[in-house]
């Protein structure tokens, strides 16, 4: 159970995608307590995502806390020197994959842990994550009592979230017409079709034949 002798702080984990956007907007509509809204910048977001974050911030007329790790993705990928273990001295973490998503820990989990510990040390923190009801595997993996999933409680599926965001005027400049997910553009969980679109787009930009 949550401790009742500490001040409760309600934090929205805001990635900027359709699910977290729908969750944030509906929480505000429902007059739910929100003390902080946190966006964790991996430095490899789609350019349109940064525009979306600014648009949401203006729409809700509230500050979105933007947190970023000390080093960017390129540095960690290619230049970071490992300090211990069998790979001590090795440069770069290499590209993340399904088994080794070091980027999630470095750019997200460790950053928000440090932020909460620093700013809300003596508080009872409750986080809100945007996981839809049709993502049972993700919901099953996240059973922490300090994390709540309003979308699942509202019985909203992913398509409901997207439609809701569209109805509020948010369209990410058409990104969801091309990609199933809008995390980092280089995310190892990106679907093959999305990776092909990124590949073709960059070939055109670079003028490669």
Which residues make up each language-model segment?
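Nucleotide-activated chemistry modules centered on ATP-dependent adenylation/adenylyltransferase
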Residues: 1-209
């Amino acid at each position: 159970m949550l401790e009742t002798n500490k001040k409760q702080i309600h934090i929205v984990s805001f990635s900027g995608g359709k699910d977290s956007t729908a969750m944030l907007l509906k929480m505000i509509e429902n007059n739910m307590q929100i003390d902080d809204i946190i966006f964790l910048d991996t430095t490899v977001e789609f350019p349109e995502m940064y525009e979306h974050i600014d648009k949401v911030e203006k729409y809700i007329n509230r500050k979105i806390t933007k947190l970023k790790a000390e080093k960017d993705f390129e540095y960690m990928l290619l230049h970071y020197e490992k300090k211990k273990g069998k790979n001590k001295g090795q440069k770069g973490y290499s590209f993340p994959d399904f088994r080794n998503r070091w980027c999630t820990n470095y750019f997200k989990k460790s950053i928000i842990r440090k932020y909460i510990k620093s700013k809300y040390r003596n508080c009872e923190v409750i986080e809100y994550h945007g996981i839809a009801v049709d993502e049972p595997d993700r919901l099953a993996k996240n059973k922490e009592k300090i994390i709540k999933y309003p979308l699942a409680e509202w019985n909203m599926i992913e398509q409901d979230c997207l439609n809701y965001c569209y109805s509020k005027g948010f369209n990410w400049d058409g990104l969801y017409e091309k990609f199933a997910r809008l995390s980092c553009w280089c995310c190892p969980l990106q679907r093959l079709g999305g990776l092909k679109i990124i590949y073709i787009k960059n070939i055109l930009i670079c003028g490669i034949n």
